[in-house]
């Protein structure tokens, strides 16, 4: 079974490398830890500390790929909203020169305006090695106009 390195950065940890390094766990334990966080309480703390963020950082020790799920303190809705950032590379085709030329640019998979359940789904997909699925969701997300929490 694959193990994942888990770090959690709380709002009071303001240094760039400040985070609680909790160790290596299997995917089931990581999901339990994600569910165990009092996200509403973290949101209140973030707002009290002027937007310092809470991050749930998971690294696949085999591939070195990392995802960071960040609680968005300044969401436009009343619901919890998350962002997902990663170091997982993805090639994106972009049109230039009035749409006549297409070039590929390297980007990293990321998502904004995620609900807690959607963020957990993406976390599970990452831990199950479903990177191609995340890439497809990212590409699909790029082609959609912006909307509120999904």
Indicate where each model-derived feature is located.
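Negatively charged, low-complexity tracts enriched in Asp/Glu with abundant Ser/Thr
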Residues: 2-66
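Generic signal for short, ordered secondary-structure residues
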Residues: 9, 13, 101-105, 145-146
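Short, highly charged C-terminal tails/helix-capping segments
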Residues: 135-150
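Amphipathic protein-protein interaction modules
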Residues: 59-131
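N-terminal domain-start interaction segment
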Residues: 1, 16, 79-83
